[in-house]
């Protein structure tokens, strides 16, 4: 092959590889699941305002345990899993679950 043809073929190959890589990278759902959801945590939240708690254990997406509280107004907030208030809230939830 002549050098200009070789360069053109190389450029076309690089362009195709970039397009293929870019197409796979557009999966925003996958990308958002591969990082920690809780970048900041609230120091405290009232037990009465919590509708539900979601605990996500450490994994390949995040090395930390994450606790996300859904409040009665629909807002989701991150809580410190080591916080003493959260430990009290978890005990209250477990206690209320046993009594029902």
UniProtKB/Swiss-Prot annotation:
GO terms for biological process: cellular response to lipopolysaccharide; immune response; inflammatory response; neutrophil chemotaxis; positive regulation of cytosolic calcium ion concentration. Induction: By lipopolysaccharide. Residues 1-31 form the signal peptide. InterPro entries: Chemokine_b/g/d, Chemokine_CXC, Chemokine_CXC_CS, Chemokine_IL8-like_dom, CXC_Chemokine_domain, Interleukin_8-like_sf. Keywords: Chemotaxis, Cytokine, Disulfide bond, Inflammatory response, Secreted, Signal. One of its GO terms (molecular function) is chemokine activity. The keyword Signal applies. Pfam families: IL8 (PF00048). This is C-X-C motif chemokine 3. The gene is Cxcl3.
């Amino acid at each position: 092959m002549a050098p200009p043809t070789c360069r053109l073929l190389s450029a076309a190959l690089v362009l195709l590889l970039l397009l293929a890589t870019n197409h796979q990278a557009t999966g925003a759902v996958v990308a958002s699941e591969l990082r920690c959801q809780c970048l900041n945590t609230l120091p405290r939240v009232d037990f009465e305002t919590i509708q539900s708690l979601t605990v996500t254990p450490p994994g390949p997406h995040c090395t930390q345990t994450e606790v996300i509280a859904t409040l009665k107004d629909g807002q989701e907030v991150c809580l410190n899993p080591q916080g003493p208030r959260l430990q009290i809230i978890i005990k209250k939830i477990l206690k209320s679950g046993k009594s029902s």
